Amino acid sequence: MAVSVGINGFGRIGRLAFRAMADKDIQVVGINDIVEPKILAHLLKWDSVHGPFPGTVSADTDALVVNGKRIPVSAERDPAKIPWKQWGARIVVESTGLFTAREKAKAHLAAGAERVIISAPAEDPDVTLVLGVNDAAYDPAKHFIVSNASCTTN
C-alpha cells in the first residue's frame, strides 16, 4: 500500500522531494504553494541541474497533472487550513523553511496529517534524523514532528 504524502512548499526542495518520491511506493496527494500551478508545472518539468522530469507534467487551474495523475494544489499561507485530511495526506513534507518551530509545524497535524517531516533544521522537533547516521532512532510511537537536519545533509 502506498504511503500518502503532501508537500508544503514546492520550491527547490519540495520539487526534489517530489522527484525522489515519483518512482517509489509513495503517492503525493496534494501540494501547497503560493505560486500558481502553471508555473509549478513548468519548474517541475524543466530542471536546469537534474534535467527534464521523466514523464508528463501539465497544470489545471487548481492542480498539477503528472503522468496522468491529478494532484490538487492549494495556496494557503496558514498550514492549519491546508486540506491534508481531505486529500488523505498521512505525512507532510514541510519544505517552505517557514514552519520549522514545533508550534508552527503542529498546524499540519491539526489539518489532518499524522506526521510532519521538516526539511530544514528545526528548533524543537520530536527528533532530528540524518539518514545513515541516526535514522534507527526513529520511534513512530513518539516521533510526530521530525527534522531532516538540513535539506543539504540528506
Language model regions located:
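N-terminal Rossmann-like NAD(P) cofactor-binding subdomain of oxidoreductases
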Residues: 1-154
